[in-house]
C-alpha cells in the first residue's frame, strides 16, 4: 500500500513537472503575454489616435465657423459701404426738398408785370437745373394721380367720399413725395376717397 501511495504521489509530481515544463517551453504562452502587452499598447495608441482625430474634427468645425463669420462680416461691410455710397446724398436732398417745394409754389404764381415774367422764367430755369441734378442722384417723384393709396408711399391726411373715385383711390396730392433710388425719403401727403 505504501508502494501504491508512492506511485500516486510520484505520478502527481511527474504531472506537475510536465505541466511546468510545458508552460515554460510553450512559446504560445510567451506570445500571448507579448500579444496582450502589444494589444494594450495598440489600444492605447488607437485611443490616442481617436482622441486626436476628434480634436482635428473639432478644430475643422471651428475653422469653418470662423470662415463663415468672416465671410458674413465682409458681406455686411460691403453692403454697408454700397448703401452709404448709394444714399450719400440723402441728408442733403432732404434739406433741399422744402426749398424745392417753395420753388414750385413760386412758379404757380401768375405774373402781372413783364419784369416779374422774366424773373419767373429765370427761377423756372434754376428749378429745372436743380431738379435734373437731383434726378441724376436718384431722386424720383412719387406718382399719386389716379393711384391707389399705398401706406408705404403715401400719407393720408384727409379722407373724402366722392362717387367719381374708387374706394381707397387718391383724390388729390397735397404735398409731393420723393424716393431716393428705392427708399422713400418723404411720403406724398394725399387726400383719399373713402
From Swiss-Prot:
Biased composition (Acidic residues): 10-44
Keywords: Chaperone, Cytoplasm, Stress response
Protein name according to UniProt: Protein GrpE
Gene: grpE
Complexes and interactors: Homodimer.
InterPro entries recorded: GrpE, GrpE_coiled_coil, GrpE_head
Protein species of origin: Halalkalibacterium halodurans (strain ATCC BAA-125 / DSM 18197 / FERM 7344 / JCM 9153 / C-125) (Bacillus halodurans)
GO biological process: protein folding
GO molecular function (one): unfolded protein binding
The keyword Chaperone is annotated on this UniProt entry: yes
Amino acid at each position: 500500500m505504501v508502494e501504491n501511495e508512492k506511485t500516486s504521489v510520484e505520478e502527481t509530481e511527474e504531472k506537475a513537472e510536465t505541466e511546468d515544463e510545458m508552460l515554460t517551453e510553450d512559446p504560445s504562452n510567451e506570445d500571448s503575454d507579448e500579444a496582450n502587452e502589444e494589444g494594450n499598447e495598440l489600444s492605447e495608441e488607437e485611443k490616442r489616435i481617436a482622441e486626436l482625430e476628434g480634436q482635428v474634427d473639432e478644430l475643422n468645425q471651428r475653422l469653418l465657423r470662423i470662415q463663415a463669420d468672416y465671410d458674413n462680416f465682409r458681406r455686411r461691410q460691403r453692403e454697408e459701404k454700397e448703401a452709404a455710397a448709394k444714399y450719400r446724398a440723402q441728408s442733403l436732398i432732404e434739406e433741399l426738398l422744402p426749398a424745392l417745394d417753395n420753388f414750385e409754389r413760386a412758379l404757380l404764381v401768375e405774373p402781372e408785370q413783364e419784369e416779374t415774367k422774366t424773373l419767373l422764367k429765370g427761377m423756372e430755369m434754376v428749378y429745372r437745373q436743380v431738379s435734373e441734378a437731383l434726378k441724376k442722384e436718384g431722386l424720383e417723384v412719387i406718382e399719386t394721380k389716379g393711384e391707389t393709396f399705398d401706406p408705404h408711399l403715401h400719407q393720408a391726411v384727409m379722407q373724402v367720399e366722392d362717387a367719381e373715385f374708387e374706394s381707397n383711390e387718391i383724390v388729390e396730392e397735397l404735398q409731393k413725395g420723393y424716393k431716393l433710388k428705392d427708399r422713400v425719403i418723404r411720403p406724398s401727403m394725399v387726400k383719399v376717397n373713402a
